[in-house]
């Protein structure tokens, strides 16, 4: 979602917001690289687990990132979301009704920006999603601004999910021994 934010800002000429978004995306990539060894392509998940145990600093750094990101997200809204030019360009543009979203199969943030409650994590929870509390972000306007806001609010929901899980990462084997 930080990449989405950054690229949208760049496309709209809001270069300060673009640089802020990429700066903060780098913080996320630094944490991932420390554990997975890759910045953009992690190749970390495997059949039976993951390639390696998490880095000893992982939990600490994730908590620091969450603490850092909350006020930064408010700053994003101050410098971009509230910008009259951004609002004029995004509001009322590219409207997708709920009916069309369902008909076209536009799931994810696009569907939810049109008022379609289609978050698979809520409808058919998998992994740990059934054990965490989070809000399915919905807007009804169906325009570009609603799609933007869904993604921005989903960043906050992602932080809530991570906060609920970060201290509960199980210890022990990180990859099951399996026969080929």
List the predicted regions and their residue ranges.
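Active-site bordering "gate/hinge" segments
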Residues: 1-180
